[in-house]
């Protein structure tokens, strides 16, 4: 009963969070409809082979051959036995609520836990949770299907709560919270978001250090730091399998450093990613106003003609053109929506800079500024280059605009610290009233100026790319269209400027009513909560709304087979590849649903495969399209050995070609080398550049090109004859069996992608795999008949799983200790009360 009485308000807040989350998704959640996410729908094919194999065998394969010729599945819905227990704990944490509903619920609950750790009263903590959770970006990523990112962001505030508790001297609670939520965080599997929030934690720890130095409590600071480190290590240990294999995989992907020495070395970073690639999605400098004015740059990249209110100003003669132009006019290539943290929240943040005292304020301000400067990316390259070159791991992540998640955390937190100061010390509104006016002027004042004189502060409402595109129109149309388009977009902009102005004015009025004692503090908090919730709810409904939800059957329906798919699937050969030339080959996974594709889509494909795409595969695709078209599909008239040798070595047995009317046709490639073949010779080279160049200079059917470091494994081959045969007799994605017959022996090249962790046996005896032709596996066998098996069951899985289970044991022990300490504490309190 005492427990219920103590935590009743907290329980009511949690129930309110669940209700708010349900209501946002009504009526879709009541109808059982689900979000049609393009990313999820397009990704069906990516993991289809993995899912089928698991259904048929009960085994989880760590390799699939369905995309990019073959790649690990570590970043395709990663699943490890040790994570099953953690997954059940996670489900309990979000109260087994349905999808989408629980995403918003854990946003709310996580920030609430953190604010309670900061010693906020329940009502203020609930308000703070609303303004953080309803930040627009968090709903935009739900709509886009970036669910791992959703989870990662939701678990970071409660993880920080553990850090806060530890530095407040509550070591055991801090340890448990840090351990549990760092485990949740790592399992969420979005390293980029976790990495960005480490900057927040770093600044906060510096603030705690400054406070400890001031108070002479360095020993306490050291103890708290140790507690946080131990908690983080426990959380990491529970996810060691995922972490280790993600790290290992990362070394081999586009996020790892390339062995190629490129001519344009200045554009390269230590991670191997190009600077242009990393900064492609950079927030515009003037786009930063979206933090306070959501449509400062028009919102999302949707057709302008969809905005009915804006189109009231459109010239009817140009409506067709506006179907082609986006509502967004910023300098990003495109966007699903802006980063909006709330207009009145921005005012409270500015006010917090004046009235909140202590090092934590400066830590939050520094993190906010850092976040904004880094989000500018290519628009502020000196600063960006410094981080790319000197800050560990920063160059491994693209879409730098997403680092604004830091500002989306720090702005609401400092805003809530300001409101807490006002609630705890009401007299501050009288003593520091000039700061309230200043904060109002710096926020509502700018909104008013922008609304009245938009052209003075923002001269361009048409992007550079749009201006260039419009130059293709007849000269007499360009000026009227530009003028009308500018008027339309000014209307979009000024509408939201007025909107933000009124929201800040209403919020400020609530503060003034509290100052004049015409409104109690709880009523003021409730009023601000309603104001901010309505404000941000309405903005979020622009990007995540009911019409985006469909019947579950519509999304979960298996991908329909085309006639082309049916024809290719009649081929009963165990393993071959398909190249879809009728699609955006390297930006789709539909082909992978039924076939082993040369193409695919994954943000972290193997680096060497990408380099082969750039150097050989893409050029061969163009030549293939041209040659097959000129031959009218008659492959006997195509010189396949010289036109597409790399596609042949990848055992590309079928090309899918486009026809008129959106139809396709399969064309069989008679030049494909098959699953494996003996070569006459191995040419050894000294580096990656020589290796990738050498692939284009030899007859790959007879000669293999290998780095000299594989000379010990592969040695040399011998000239072969027609009696040398390699035949695949069993196929599993993670286990391939071949029957080999050869009177001479030598080097066998497999049309399979080389990756560390694959092992080979010949007649059940282990042999070392080598890498040839830049991306393929190879072994050397002796003369005779042999059974060769290639297998992918990395030993590292067993080792990391064992460590994870040890971590579980430590966590359970800590929980038992925590319960014991709490019981002992209550007994002492009860005994003291009796005395």
Language-model features, listed with the residues they occupy:
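Membrane-interface coil-to-helix junctions
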Residues: 18-114, 130-153, 267-341, 374-384, ...
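Active-site-proximal, structured, solvent-exposed surfaces of multi-pass membrane proteins
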Residues: 347, 653, 662, 702-835
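Hydrophobic alpha-helical transmembrane segments
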Residues: 82, 97-111, 337-352, 407-416, ...
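Extracytoplasmic/lumenal acceptor-recognition loop(s) of multi-pass membrane glycoenzymes
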Residues: 54, 59, 65-69, 76-79, ...
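Polar, glycine-rich mid-to-C-terminal structural blocks
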Residues: 223-283
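Transmembrane signal-anchor helices characteristic of membrane glycosylation enzymes that use polyprenol
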Residues: 10-46, 231-245, 370-374, 446-451, ...
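Transmembrane-helix signature of polytopic, membrane-embedded enzymes
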Residues: 115-134, 172-175
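Contiguous transmembrane helix-bundle modules in multi-pass membrane proteins
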Residues: 129, 145-156, 166-183, 191-193, ...
């Amino acid at each position: 009963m005492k427990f219920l009485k103590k935590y009743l308000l907290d329980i009511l807040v949690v129930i309110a969070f669940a209700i708010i989350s349900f209501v946002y998704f009504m009526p879709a959640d009541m109808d059982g409809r689900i979000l049609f996410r393009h990313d999820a729908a397009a990704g069906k094919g990516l993991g289809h082979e993995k899912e089928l194999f698991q259904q048929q065998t009960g085994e989880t394969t760590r390799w699939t051959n369905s995309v990019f010729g073959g790649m690990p599945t570590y970043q395709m819905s990663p699943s490890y036995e040790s994570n099953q227990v953690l997954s059940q704990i996670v489900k309990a944490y979000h109260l087994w609520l349905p999808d989408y509903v629980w995403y918003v619920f854990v946003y709310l609950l996580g920030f609430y836990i953190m604010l309670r750790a900061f010693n906020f009263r329940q009502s203020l903590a609930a308000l703070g949770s609303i303004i953080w959770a309803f930040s627009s970006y968090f709903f935009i990523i739900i709509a886009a299907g970036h669910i791992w990112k959703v989870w990662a962001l939701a678990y970071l505030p409660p993880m920080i709560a553990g850090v806060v508790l530890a530095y407040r001297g509550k070591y055991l609670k801090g340890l448990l919270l840090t351990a549990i939520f760092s485990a949740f965080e790592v399992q969420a599997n979005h390293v980029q978001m976790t990495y960005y929030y480490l900057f927040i934690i770093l600044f906060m720890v510096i603030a705690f250090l400054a406070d400890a130095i001031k108070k002479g409590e360095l020993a306490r600071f050291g103890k708290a730091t140790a507690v946080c480190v131990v908690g983080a290590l426990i959380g990491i240990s529970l996810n060691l399998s995922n972490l280790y294999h993600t790290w290992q995989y990362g070394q081999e992907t586009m996020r790892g450093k390339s062995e190629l020495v490129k001519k344009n070395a200045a554009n390269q970073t230590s991670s191997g990613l190009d600077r242009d690639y990393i900064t492609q999605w950079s927030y515009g400098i003037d786009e930063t106003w979206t933090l306070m004015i959501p449509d400062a740059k028009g919102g999302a990249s949707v057709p302008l003609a969809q905005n009915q209110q804006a189109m009231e100003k459109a010239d009817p003669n140009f409506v067709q053109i506006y179907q082609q132009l986006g509502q967004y006019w910023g300098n990003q290539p495109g966007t699903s929506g802006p980063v909006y943290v709330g207009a009145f929240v921005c005012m409270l943040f500015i006010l917090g800079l004046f009235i909140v005292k202590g090092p934590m304020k400066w830590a939050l301000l520094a993190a906010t500024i850092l976040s904004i400067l880094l989000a500018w990316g290519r628009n502020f390259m000196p600063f960006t280059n410094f981080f790319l070159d000197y800050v560990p791991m920063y160059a491994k992540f693209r879409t730098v605009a997403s680092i604004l998640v830091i500002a989306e955390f720090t702005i609401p937190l400092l805003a809530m610290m300001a409101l807490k100061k006002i609630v705890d010390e009401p007299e501050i509104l009288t003593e520091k009233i000039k700061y309230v006016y200043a904060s109002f002027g710096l926020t509502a004042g700018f909104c008013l100026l922008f609304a009245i004189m938009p052209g003075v502060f923002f001269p361009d409402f048409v992007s550079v790319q749009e201006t260039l595109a419009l130059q293709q129109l007849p000269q007499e149309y360009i000026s009227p269209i530009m003028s009308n388009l500018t008027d339309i977009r000014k209307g979009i902009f000024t509408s939201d400027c007025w909107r933000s102005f009124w929201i800040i004015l209403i919020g400020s009025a609530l503060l003034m009513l509290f100052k004049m004692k015409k409104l109690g503090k709880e009523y003021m908090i409730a009023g601000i909560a309603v104001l901010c919730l309505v404000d941000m709810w309405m903005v979020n409904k622009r990007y995540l709304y009911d019409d985006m939800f469909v019947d579950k059957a519509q999304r979960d329906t298996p991908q329909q087979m085309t006639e082309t798919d049916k024809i290719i699937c009649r081929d009963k050969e165990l393993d071959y590849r398909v190249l879809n030339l009728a699609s955006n080959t390297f930006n789709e996974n539909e082909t992978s649903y039924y076939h082993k594709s040369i193409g695919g889509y994954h943000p972290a494909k193997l680096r060497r495969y990408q380099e082969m795409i750039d150097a050989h595969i893409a050029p061969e695709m163009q030549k293939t399209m041209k040659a097959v078209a000129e031959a009218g599909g008659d492959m006997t008239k195509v010189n396949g050995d010289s036109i597409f040798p790399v596609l042949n070595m990848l055992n590309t047995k079928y090309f899918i070609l486009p026809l008129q009317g959106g139809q396709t046709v399969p064309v069989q490639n008679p030049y494909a080398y098959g699953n494996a073949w003996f070569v006459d010779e191995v040419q050894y080279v000294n580096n990656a550049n020589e290796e990738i160049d050498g692939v284009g200079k030899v007859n790959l059917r007879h000669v293999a090109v290998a780095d000299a470091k594989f000379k010990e494994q592969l040695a040399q081959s011998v000239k072969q004859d027609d009696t040398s045969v390699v035949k695949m007799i069993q196929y599993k994605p993670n286990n391939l069996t071949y029957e080999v017959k050869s009177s001479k022996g030598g080097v066998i090249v497999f049309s399979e992608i080389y990756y560390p962790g694959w092992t080979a046996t010949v007649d059940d005896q282990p042999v070392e795999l080598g890498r040839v032709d830049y991306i393929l596996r190879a072994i050397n066998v002796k003369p005779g008949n042999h059974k060769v098996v290639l297998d992918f069951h990395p030993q590292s899985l067993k080792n990391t799983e064992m460590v994870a289970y040890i971590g579980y044991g430590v966590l359970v022990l800590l929980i038992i200790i925590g319960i014991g300490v709490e019981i002992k504490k209550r007994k002492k309190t009860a005994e003291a009360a009796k005395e």
